[in-house]
Amino acid sequence: MGFCRGLENNAAEGADGFKDFLQIIDELERLGAENDWCKEVGERLRKSKLYLKTTYRNHCKEDDSKCADHCRVFALSDAGDTDFQKICSHSHKVKCEDCEKLKNVLEEVKGAISEYTMQLGMFQAEDDLYEAKNAAAKIFEWRGHILRAENQDWYKRQIVDTLKRDETFIIVDWTMKFIAMKFWEKQVE
């Protein structure tokens, strides 16, 4: 059961985040970073993007996931505000290999920027680190949106599954529109 939601902005921003990281890798390669390392990191970035586009949502379907990155209850709770927290009845001791690979490759690129500060120059290195942090934020915001969308779909399925024969479930969403999947683009520029 797929429900319409404003995915195009988040997906486009997340894809831009990956593109920004790939551009930083290209810049580091021009400055002397090893070609093999650049290719390998670029491939890891592409695999991480594919993971978010395809598999991550399926990992978030479990109601009581032992992985903090997949547990809807834990991941959607606000650690800083008790009004927006829900306590899980299980621990989160499992780490997802794909989620860890994503975090590691982003940190590795940030570390490489720091290593090439002399070649980049202080101001360019600061700019690249700023770009990398913003790109990572876009990627994790996209990941969060996927998790929220799965949570929303889960609750909608629960409602639909419990409807009685004489009941109706209506979704009113004033922002719904037809979006061609091939042309997902940002709405704001």
Regions found by a protein language model. Give the residues of each.
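Extended mixed-charge, aromatic/glycine-enriched low-complexity segments
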Residues: 1-189
